[in-house]
Amino acid sequence: WIMGHMVNDLEMVDYYVDKGANGLEIDITFNSNGIAEYTYHGVPCDCFRNCRRNTTLSTYLNYVRQLTTPGDQKFRQNLIFIIMDLKLNRLKSQALFNAGLSIADRLTQYYWKDDGKARAYFLLSVPYVRQAAFIRGFQSRFEEKGLKKYYEKIGWDFSANEDLNRIREAYQKLNISGHIWQSDGITNCLTRRTRRLKEAIRKRDSPGWYINKVYSWSLDRYKSIKYALDLGVDGVMSNYADRLVKILSKGTYKRRFRLATHEDNPWETFTP
């Protein structure tokens, strides 16, 4: 899985899909009441990137709906996965719950409005386990509106590099036991040790654990991308998706890996 990083306007969507990404990471901002409004990161962000690109979430979801709907004139077969990086850190408890309601509503109104013909999977990436009220709000709206059929398109991630055992406990409290990706990473401006990443991969491959997939971010250097692949990650988030495509086209990486397609289930743990 190749996720283009910080893809927050329509021009960048086209850019990363053209570069070979089969996934996009978008930043979702909320107002103080927890209403999802824009795809926007803001300053600071990754080095050598424009931090201020943005569009309204409704416009964005309408566009990617077209790109991921077979038969649409704008359909792009390789785009199958979208990570929503949820900017929740300024929200209070009730606003966190409202934010979950809001994302469920936005997906229903603008992405699944053709009764689910659009086929992308969404990973809802919450920073901290203390923000689990977002997930409860999302679940509440799904229950209220009878949207359970769309759960097959939804996965979960806690992205702030917290203790993995604490994350497991949070999922247990939320009654979530599948569709779980575990991220590990840091801005491309800095380097990060790989102890936690290795631990996540070990737990993914251990019976009884909660992790289905592991991805690393933001990896831009060829050496860093190759090292993550050698460790056994399922996905890489990068500002240079074409570099990963190039790596996967050569030598041992071509023999060991391939780019995921829509036929691959993002919620299943891969077994060689």
Swiss-Prot record:
Keywords: Cytolysis, Dermonecrotic toxin, Disulfide bond, Hemolysis, Lipid degradation, Lipid metabolism, Lyase, Magnesium, Metal-binding, Secreted, Toxin. The keyword tRNA processing does not apply. Its main location: secreted. Binds 1 Mg(2+) ion per subunit. Expressed by the venom gland. Dermonecrotic toxins cleave the phosphodiester linkage between the phosphate and headgroup of certain phospholipids (sphingolipid and lysolipid substrates), forming an alcohol (often choline) and a cyclic phosphate. This toxin acts on sphingomyelin (SM). It may also act on ceramide phosphoethanolamine (CPE), lysophosphatidylcholine (LPC) and lysophosphatidylethanolamine (LPE), but not on lysophosphatidylserine (LPS), and lysophosphatidylglycerol (LPG). It acts by transphosphatidylation, releasing exclusively cyclic phosphate products as second products. This is Dermonecrotic toxin StSicTox-betaIF1. It comes from Sicarius terrosus (Cave spider).
